[in-house]
């Protein structure tokens, strides 16, 4: 019947593909895959031929042995099939060691680290067979070793295996395998030997072949060739003529693991730790992952992808490794292609962003440039951005700073609402209310860099107001950033805005107490004046100069030449601003030493005069800018030599500029009054520097190194009477920063706040009417919502009123004599 004549190989659940590679003993190896799932496998095939009964019996022995032997260093059996014509053995996907070495020749060959771990695995497999299984492999050579995709060596070739003490039952080897026989097999006088002697001789042959290629004849073992020096003494023991001196496999491992031994290196140590990682203590895992990133550069790429990466993912998924897995994770991610990255790394990254661990959040923000290109827009807007924005309101300044800088990378992938609404609200609050000067400066910097991605309506509403506010910031680099912001985004302003809004603001900056800020203001003013003169001389060029004003999406290269004031990658600006934290009277640390990462506390007032501000950027992208002066371009960069002192000045009340909102109409007289007041305050030379962001020492600059024209640092003026803090001055930490304030007060703004809290002011910060940065809706409420609620304000007013009534009653009781209506008795 046809049923009985059907070929059983048709039901074989694996497809055999690829070319057949011949192996000793009649075997061949081919690549294959499972028919249902497509999982890759290796298929060993043996064709049964008449007249080769001994070889066929050895092949069947190998098929039986591989099914029963389970060990990490022995070839893993998956499936098999035996017919009258052929034998099939399906294993994990592997490559013969000889083929693997040839493939690696073009890339520099197999490194000693790989060889050390590979031999370590083969010796462990022999130790298992001899000491635990009481079995003799009897075929250890290069053709019996296979390499998996992670670069790990597996022992195969079980054709000639036999039980220890039953040597007579072993199948006879082929002629091509006789060169691996130990000398005692032919010399009957050397009958005294250990059970492992033959396998250890073959191990010596394997070592010779790994370093020197296929063994031509047994006498070639006397020549060391390229064998590693640290392995030579142990190799000589293996190929010694006396079988009694050949060590046990476990003893051989111990000898090579001793200090200075061939198996004593970071690669072997890493692998041994990974094998036992499930039973390691959390502290040991923490230390291991911290040191792993440094060693990855010397490890094979395949090993990192297929061995270490799964362990990192498992450690994050089920362990408590935390943020320490991120550096090695992203380092290995560079070895993956786009599909592998999307499949393995991105799901973990998305999950990490929802973590409440601050260390993990800041590490993610710092490493974002490594994986941002693999994130698609729906993932960024739906799963990442909602978690990232929480960093804008974090109490840790380092997280706020990193969150701001990460927007440089996220902005191109944000949708309309997240970019033009949510992000701008957070930027408005940070620039107006954050107590860290570097963070306010970084916010201005970032806004200028992402300006091309904003829609035209948002740009017209936000940019002028934001940069105008920055020019009145007490932190000098913030003022410089505001001036440079105007220069970098000059093509987004109409000629009417340039003349009516931008130039009046820049003219006010020409009286800035810092020379570098003034110089940049003059250069930027000349740039805008050149544009206006061009239009005045040739009105037909107006359309060309305003072509980007209403462009929906400008190219990011528009602001790419902003004199390096910010860079595409994420780095820290704060570390440039903050060098020392003590005052002049304190013993300051050495210049350039990074501040320790600690929580920032409000420092007490001191009498240190305000140091000079860092240089401002020297170029603008405008084609109308005149040539820079040679003196500015030739000066040396003094940023690292500046002693920035404490970032909180002695006189907060005088140096703090009025907190006007970004929705201010620059044509109104009240704004001009504010500008005059700000200029007059600055002209006295009183500045406020905010507390240093000590945690920013984690980074190394946000591209400001070449940003500003550098000039020699100004000499510190001697402390004069005008620079001493007035009596009764309080530090910034004593003020209620969340309370609404007034704009038109002179003197100590905060100490008189309670007396005027019930009065309505013209300042938009306290206005109840809806507004925004440019005069539209929803922006005023952003900052107003950050303060006290109406119920709390009303309650405070009642309490203050009650205190006033009680004080008057106490005064009347203390008065002498009777009081008449409308008359106050004088003492």
Swiss-Prot record:
Coiled-coil intervals, chain numbering: 788-817
Described purpose of this protein according to its UniProt entry: Regulates COPI-mediated retrograde protein traffic at the interface between the Golgi apparatus and the endoplasmic reticulum. Involved in the maintenance of the Golgi apparatus morphology.
InterPro entries in the record: ARM-like, ARM-type_fold, CIK-Related_Protein, Kinase-like_dom_sf, Prot_kinase_dom
User: Where is the chain membrane-spanning?
Assistant: none
Member of which family?
Answer: Belongs to the protein kinase superfamily.
Name this protein carries in UniProt: N-terminal kinase-like protein
Spans of HEAT repeats, please give: 345-383, 384-422, 502-540
User: Which domain of life does the protein's organism represent?
Assistant: Eukaryota
Extent of Basic and acidic residues compositional bias: 629-638, 757-766, 792-814
Q: Where is the composition biased (Low complexity)?
A: 615-624
Check the record and name the PROSITE patterns matching this protein.
Answer: PROTEIN_KINASE_DOM (PS50011)
Residues covered by region (Disordered): 580-827
Record remark on domains? The protein kinase domain is predicted to be catalytically inactive.
Give the compositionally biased regions (Acidic residues): 639-650, 774-783
Recite the UniProt keywords alphabetically: Coiled coil, Repeat
Q: Domain Protein kinase spans what residues?
A: 16-309
GO terms assigned for molecular function: ATP binding; protein kinase activity
The Polar residues compositionally biased stretches are 666-677, 742-756
Q: Coiled coil: is it a keyword of this entry?
A: yes
- Name a Pfam family for this protein: Pkinase
């Amino acid at each position: 019947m046809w049923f009985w004549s059907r070929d059983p190989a048709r039901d074989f659940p694996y497809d055999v593909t690829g070319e057949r590679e011949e192996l000793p003993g009649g075997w061949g190896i081919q690549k294959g895959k499972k028919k249902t799932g497509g999982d890759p496998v290796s298929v060993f095939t043996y064709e049964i031929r008449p007249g080769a009964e001994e070889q066929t019996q050895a092949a069947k022995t190998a098929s039986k042995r591989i099914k029963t032997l389970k060990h990490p260093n022995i070839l893993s059996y998956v499936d098999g099939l035996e017919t009258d014509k052929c034998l099939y053995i399906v294993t994990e996907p592997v490559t013969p060691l000889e083929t693997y070495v040839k493939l690696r020749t073009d890339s520099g060959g197999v490194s000693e680290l790989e060889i050390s771990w590979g031999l370590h695995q083969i010796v462990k497999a022999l130790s298992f067979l001899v000491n635990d299984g009481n079995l003799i492999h009897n075929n250890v050579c290069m053709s019996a070793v296979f390499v998996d995709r992670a670069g790990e060596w597996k022992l195969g070739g079980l054709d000639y295996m036999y039980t220890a003490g039953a040597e007579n039952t072993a199948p006879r080897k082929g002629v091509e395998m006789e060169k691996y026989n130990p000398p005692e097999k032919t010399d009957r006088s050397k009958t005294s030997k250990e059970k492992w002697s033959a396998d250890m001789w073959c191990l010596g042959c394997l070592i010779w072949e790994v370093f020197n290629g296929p063994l031509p004849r047994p006498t070639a073992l006397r020549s060391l060739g390229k064998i590693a020096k640290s392995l030579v003494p142990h190799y000589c023991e293996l190929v010694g003529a006396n079988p009694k001196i050949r060590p046990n496999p476990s003893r051989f491992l111990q000898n090579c693991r001793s200090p200075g031994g061939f198996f004593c290196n970071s690669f072997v140590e890493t692998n041994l730790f990974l094998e036992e990682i499930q039973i390691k203590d959390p502290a040991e895992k923490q230390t291991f992952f911290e040191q792993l990133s440094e060693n990855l550069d010397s490890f094979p790429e395949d090993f990192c992808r297929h061995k270490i990466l799964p362990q990192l993912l498992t450690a994050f998924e089920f362990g408590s490794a935390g943020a320490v897995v991120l550096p090695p994770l992203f380092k290995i991610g560079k070895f993956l292609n786009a599909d592998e990255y999307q499949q393995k790394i991105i799901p973990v990254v998305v999950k990490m962003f929802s973590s409440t661990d601050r260390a993990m959040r800041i590490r993610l923000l710092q490493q974002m440039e490594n994986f941002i290109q693999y994130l698609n827009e729906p993932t960024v807007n739906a799963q990442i951005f909602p978690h990232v924005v929480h960093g804008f309101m974090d109490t840790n300044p380092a997280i706020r700073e990193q969150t701001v800088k990460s927007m440089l990378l996220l902005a191109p992938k944000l949708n309309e609402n997240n970019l033009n609404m949510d992000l701008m609200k957070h930027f408005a609050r940070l620039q107006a209310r954050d107590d860290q000067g570097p963070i306010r400066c970084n916010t201005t910097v970032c806004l200028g860099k992402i300006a091309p991605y904003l829609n035209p309506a948002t740009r017209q509403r936000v940019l002028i107001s934001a940069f105008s506010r920055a020019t009145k910031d007490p932190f000098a680099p913030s003022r410089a950033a505001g001036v440079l912001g105007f220069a970098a985004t000059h093509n987004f302003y109409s000629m009417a805005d340039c003349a009516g809004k931008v130039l009046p603001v820049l003219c006010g900056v020409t009286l800035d107490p810092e020379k570098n800020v003034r110089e940049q203001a003059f250069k930027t003013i000349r740039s805008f004046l050149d544009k206006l003169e061009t239009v005045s001389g040739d009105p037909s060029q107006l359309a060309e100069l305003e072509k980007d004003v209403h462009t929906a999406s400008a190219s990011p290269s528009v602001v790419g030449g902003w004199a390096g004031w910010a860079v595409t990658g994420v780095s820290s600006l704060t570390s440039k601003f903050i060098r020392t934290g003590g005052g002049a009277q304190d013993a300051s640390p050495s210049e350039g030493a990074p501040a320790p990462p600690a929580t920032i506390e409000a420092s007490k007032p001191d009498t240190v005069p305000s140091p000079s501000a860092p240089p401002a950027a020297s170029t603008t992208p405008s084609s109308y800018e005149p040539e820079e002066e040679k003196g500015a371009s030739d000066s040396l960069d003094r940023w690292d030599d500046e002693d920035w002192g404490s970032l909180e000045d002695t006189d907060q009340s005088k140096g703090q500029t009025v907190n006007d909102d970004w929705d201010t109409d620059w044509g109104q007289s009240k704004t001009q009054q504010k500008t005059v007041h700000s200029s007059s305050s600055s002209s006295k030379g009183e500045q406020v520097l905010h507390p240093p962001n000590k945690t920013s020492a984690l980074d190394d600059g946000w591209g400001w190194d070449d940003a500003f024209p550098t000039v020699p640092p100004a000499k510190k003026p001697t402390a004069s009477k005008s620079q001493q803090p007035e009596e009764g001055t309080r530090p910034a930490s004593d003020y209620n920063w969340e309370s609404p304030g007034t704009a038109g007060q002179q003197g100590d703004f905060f100490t008189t706040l309670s007396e005027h809290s019930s009065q309505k002011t013209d300042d938009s910060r306290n206005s109840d009417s809806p507004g925004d940065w440019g005069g539209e809706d929803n922006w005023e409420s952003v900052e107003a919502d950050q303060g006290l609620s109406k119920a709390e304000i009303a309650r405070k007013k009642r309490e203050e009123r009650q205190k006033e009534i009680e004080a008057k009653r106490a005064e009347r009781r203390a008065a002498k004599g009777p009081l008449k209506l409308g008359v106050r008795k004088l003492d």
